[in-house]
């Protein structure tokens, strides 16, 4: 990543560098713009070529399932903060194997690469999903409600949460369960 650590970005890079995985998705663009306005140097990853996102200095084509790729990105960026948005998020996605490989193995690859840094990020936000609760008919859900995923996407996100906890002693993890409705 040629732009990192040189020119006018040097001071900014030394202070706050955020890596947003899945920057090309719904939330990535909004978050990138907001963080750039707050003074963060934003670098994103996407499995797709050609993404242009406001606020992002660079977007790197990266498949989180490829440990060498994500390790290279993490080693170059040395993020102070990470927002992990990358996932197969369509509950009707037909390739079930891809759901599990991306949402669990890809997430583990990211956490492993981050844990291997000499200076680990101040915070790593892992996005799970309210789908871990399943088809609850309650109007208001609590984090203490029963976890009962009703599809492969929900199961993969719950498994990702449990896997992420194995890194809790090495990384400052935050796990969020957002709703999209």
Residue ranges, per PLM feature:
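Rossmann-fold cofactor-recognition segment
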Residues: 56-66
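Active-site helix of classical SDR
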Residues: 156-159
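Conserved beta-loop-beta element that borders a ligand/cofactor-binding pocket
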Residues: 129, 161-181
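SDR active-site strand-loop-helix element
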Residues: 21, 45, 82-86, 124-129, ...
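N-terminal Rossmann NAD(P)H-binding glycine-rich loop of SDR-like oxidoreductase domains
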Residues: 18-36
């Amino acid at each position: 990543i040629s732009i990192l650590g040189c020119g006018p970005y040097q001071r900014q890079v030394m202070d706050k560098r955020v890596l947003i995985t899945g920057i090309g998705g719904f939330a990535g663009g909004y978050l990138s713009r907001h963080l750039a306005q707050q003074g963060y140097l934003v670098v994103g990853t996407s499995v797709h070529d050609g993404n242009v996102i406001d606020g992002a200095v660079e977007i790197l084509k990266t498949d989180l399932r490829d440990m060498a790729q994500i390790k290279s990105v993490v080693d170059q960026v040395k993020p102070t903060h990470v927002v992990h948005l990358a996932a197969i998020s369509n509950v009707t996605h037909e390739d079930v194997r891809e759901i599990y490989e991306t949402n669990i193995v890809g997430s583990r690859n990211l956490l492993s690469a981050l844990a291997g840094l000499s200076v680990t990020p101040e915070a790593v936000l892992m996005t799970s999903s309210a789908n871990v609760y399943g088809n609850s008919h309650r109007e208001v859900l609590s984090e203490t409600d029963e976890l009962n995923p009703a599809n492969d996407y929900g199961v993969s996100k719950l498994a990702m949460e449990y896997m992420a906890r194995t890194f809790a002693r090495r990384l400052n993890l935050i796990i969020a369960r957002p709703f999209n409705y």
